[in-house]
């Protein structure tokens, strides 16, 4: 936390208000972590006396105390809603959506919240006037990606879409140029731009 505080002071001094992204390489609401609902020793940095504050909440409180914007990306679903009170007008809540059904999600994303739970968290964030975004990376089943956009565009501000990599056999089965044309047409029909508007 001291390092984060130091970095925030440096960013403030440089007038660098680019949002902090939490996270593409991990998950701030990883459902398998034991400390997501446990007392955090980091509370002293944010002046919290609430022993239920998680590591993630403490970091968000610190960011908020410096009025520094943040972007959340999670597969944790409604677990993240407990921190929605910390969001300001320059912050955004995002989830990764890869599949539209539980069976595929359980196979490819073990330990993650199921798609309906993640979608519920987006709806709740939108209801609270929090900007929302979805990362659709990697696209494994283009039909499901298209269906997810159709299911969520009313309460999602921005979609980031990325192609599948490192699975040559699966990649070869997908007509990527065709998918790109179709997904761009769908986003345009829904009044959305791919990968813009979140920072």
Whereabouts are the PLM-identified features?
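C-terminal accessory regions of radical SAM enzymes
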Residues: 187-199
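Conserved AdoMet/S-adenosylmethionine-binding subsite of the radical SAM
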Residues: 2-190
